[in-house]
Structure formats: structure tokens, C-alpha cells
UniProtKB/Swiss-Prot annotation:
Its EC number is 4.2.3.153. This is Putative (5-formylfuran-3-yl)methyl phosphate synthase. It catalyses: 2 D-glyceraldehyde 3-phosphate = 4-(hydroxymethyl)-2-furancarboxaldehyde phosphate + phosphate + 2 H2O. It comes from Kitasatospora aureofaciens (Streptomyces aureofaciens). InterPro entries: 4HFCP_synth, RibuloseP-bd_barrel. Catalyzes the formation of 4-(hydroxymethyl)-2-furancarboxaldehyde phosphate (4-HFC-P) from two molecules of glyceraldehyde-3-P (GA-3-P).
């Protein structure tokens, strides 16, 4: 399982660089613009320059509306700025067909510029609160649009977490659907160390965190702490080892 960490500034990216051995992907977002809020192109470039060259940089293009042209241009801006994972939050898509239309436009825009870039279609575990596509529709949207990964996050950051809205058995079905279509499965949404057991067991490919590695557990007011990144990775590795030998980890 890969660990994706989301700094919101160059300063935080430098903190991530200090913990580079413990993380796999540096994700650029702007939390005050939403769950998958897009940051500025120059911030993506500066963060790309700040972290080790062997660490991929991902970038969100926003909690996007159903406007395929607008979203495709935003996605191209992210990949031109140096991101190799492009994440799209299907916030304004109310049907699978709308999601597919948006994601096909993104895939074309991104892959025409950089064929090896990875495109991630993200739905929301709390979709029922905002009226967007059902979480279990996202793997099919990703597959039919030519994307590389399907993701779930939470749209409303009010202290509720991924498993509060989509229980582990439903997340496991999400992962299974993604894998059946040859996609990576990414899960996020106020994930904590306590969630790592079920996330590991269900075969999650990428886990995304911010609050769990911020001072005080606060994704907005807190700053990413290298020692918390290291601790989170250590717990991930412990669960991976114990899962590999069939021994349930004790939290």
C-alpha cells in the first residue's frame, strides 16, 4: 500500500521532503477550497522542485462541476505544472454518464501531453450529502473513461470519516470493483492509524492522509510533522507484515 501525503504549501512540502523515505506520493491540494481543492500552478511547480525527484507528485484539479471542457483545461494545467498523478473530484456529476464525460475529457487532455501520467477519478464517501454519483459507480466511471485509478474521499470535512459513510465491507467492494477493471484503488477521508487494519486487509493500493500527520490532527490549522509521517508509515508497515503472515494486527 502506497502512502500519499497532502501538503498545502511549499513549506509543508519541505517537511514532507524531510520524511521522504516514509512516503510514496506527495499530493498538492488547497484544503480551504474543498476536499479536493485545487492549488495554484506555481505551487505545484514549486512543490515538484522541493521534493526528491523520485517521489511522484499528484495534484487535485478541484471538486469539479459538470463542465468537461473546464475540467480538461484544469487537468492539463496540473500535468504541465509537473504533476504525474491527476486527481478529479466528481463533485458536480450527478449521474455516471456525466462522470464518464468529464473523465474522458480529462484523460484525453492529460495523456495527449504526458502519456505516462496517471488519471484518478475520485468520488465521495458522503455523496448522499452533496448529491453526486454513488461511490460504487466510480470504478466503472474510471474504467469506461480510460482513467488509471478510482478513489474515494469525503467531501465535507466536519470530523466524520470514510468509514462513517461507507463501511469497510462497502469499501472492500469498491476496491474489488476497481481491481476487476484493472484499476488502482485509492481511499482517503480523515483516515487514521486505526483504519489501517481494514484498509490493508481489503487490498487498498493507495491511502491518502493529511490530518493524521498534521500537528494536533488538524488538517486546516495544523502543519504536517515529519515524525507523524514516520509513525504513520511504521503502522502501515506493521499491518502489512502481519497481514502477509495471516496474523491480525492488534491496535
Amino acid at each position: 500500500m502506497l502512502l500519499l501525503i497532502s501538503p498545502d504549501s511549499v513549506e509543508e512540502a519541505l517537511d514532507c521532503a524531510k520524511a521522504a523515505e516514509h512516503l510514496d506520493i506527495v499530493d498538492v491540494k488547497k484544503p480551504d477550497e474543498g476536499s479536493l481543492g485545487a492549488n495554484f500552478p506555481w505551487v505545484i511547480r514549486e512543490i515538484r522542485d522541493a521534493v526528491p525527484a523520485d517521489k511522484p507528485v499528484s495534484a487535485t484539479v478541484g471538486d469539479v462541476p459538470y463542465k468537461p471542457g473546464t475540467v480538461a483545461q484544469a487537468a492539463l494545467g496540473a500535468v504541465v505544472s509537473g504533476a504525474t498523478y491527476i486527481k478529479v473530484g466528481l463533485y458536480g456529476c450527478t449521474t455516471p454518464d456525466q462522470g464518464i464525460e468529464v473523465m474522458r475529457a480529462v484523460v484525453r487532455a492529460v495523456k495527449d501531453h504526458r502519456p505516462d501520467a496517471l488519471v484518478v477519478a475520485s468520488g465521495y464517501a458522503d455523496a448522499h450529502r452533496i448529491g453526486c454519483v454513488n461511490p460504487l459507480a466510480v470504478p466503472d466511471i474510471a474504467a469506461r473513461s480510460g482513467a488509471d485509478a478510482a478513489m474515494l474521499d469525503t467531501a465535507i470535512k466536519d470530523g466524520t470519516r470514510l468509514f462513517d459513510h461507507v463501511p469497510p465491507e462497502v469499501c472492500a467492494e469498491f476496491v474489488r470493483l476497481a481491481h476487476t477493471s484493472g484499476l488502482l484503488a485509492a481511499l482517503a477521508g480523515s483516515v487514521t492509524q486505526a483504519d489501517l487494519g481494514p484498509l490493508t486487509h481489503m487490498g487498498t493500493d493507495i491511502v491518502g492522509v493529511r490530518g493524521a500527520v498534521c500537528e494536533g490532527g488538524d488538517r486546516n490549522a495544523g502543519r504536517i510533522q515529519p515524525h507523524l509521517v514516520a509513525a504513520f508509515r511504521a503502522e502501515m508497515d506493521r499491518h502489512a507484515r502481519e497481514h502477509a503472515v495471516g496474523v491480525p494486527a492488534v491496535n
